[in-house]
């Protein structure tokens, strides 16, 4: 069995492609069940964020397993395979392990070192367990990656001063207008909306309206910023709020655009401009709004220029983080390679146990039934103790052997000397 990751990210695919493959949490159980139904996928889980969709899997046949994952993505996004392959990346074995460690540490994020991804990796692990996708290998891998991400944030300064998607979106607007004089509307009341409010207030915004379907969630958000006096608006009045606003941020979990050229037309009559900043994936704002003369629209891919200026000063911190990651990669690799010994050890124990039982039966039959009944438990314990003591030290040394080639040679010798039949499980 081997570990593989197949996916795409902000580095390989535009938002138009990423949004088609986004898997919302409500659909995750169905997706994992579908993936596990393929014949060559043993374990699987999915990281799905606004900037990446990555499927981590333990496969019994690497080539066939990757083909199955690619086919799943093509069907999920309704994207022809020939088109999809241009945007996908595939990483195998240690490269897949290293990639997850880098993702958890924030080194693969649009915003280098951002902290939100570690929580998303942790959620991926928990949901993978909940929906029976994560088994022994992925469980250990994700735990090691979470440890790696936590170490990077506590032992380096990479998380200090990092911009986030939300802060980059606010900075993008701040560079173009004076936020203190603008009426700002936020559609959505989740974590991203909360961060938007925080960064808007820091940049001097004073007139902020929250539009959301759930009045309770809107109020919960407003309670976190009592000094801001946020205006709360039900979703039914969304277009009234937009018509009165100058800047609109969208951050909802909608799977289809909620704003488009047709439904915004009435909001821009008799006005010079409306700025739309969509930080959702899938997008909340349809591409056709770019045709509207009064509208300036941006999405997450437009934030790269803002983010780039924050990256240069963080490269040295990233190098420190990479050194830590190598330690965690080595720790996982040592554990993973030790699994190679399991089938051989099990086969040897089974063979020795068969011999013990056969010889014990012969001895008891010679001793007679009266003696056997009286002393069988003692003799049984004696023979088990001898077998366990003989096998214990070689097994400990075999598992502890860090030299991969030396361990493989030991395994080959055991198979030959004891004529063991071993089913290979890991490669």
From Swiss-Prot:
Site description Important for activity, residues in chain: 99
E.C. code: 1.2.1.70
Residues that hold substrate according to the record: 49-52, 109, 114-116, 120
Secretion signal span: none
Pathway per the UniProt entry: Porphyrin-containing compound metabolism; protoporphyrin-IX biosynthesis; 5-aminolevulinate from L-glutamyl-tRNA(Glu): step 1/2; Porphyrin-containing compound metabolism; chlorophyll biosynthesis
Class of enzymatic activity (EC top level): oxidoreductase
GO MF term set: glutamyl-tRNA reductase activity; NADP binding
Activity regulation behaviour: Feedback inhibition by heme.
Assembly and oligomerization: Homodimer.
Family affiliation: Belongs to the glutamyl-tRNA reductase family.
Name of the protein this chain belongs to: Glutamyl-tRNA reductase
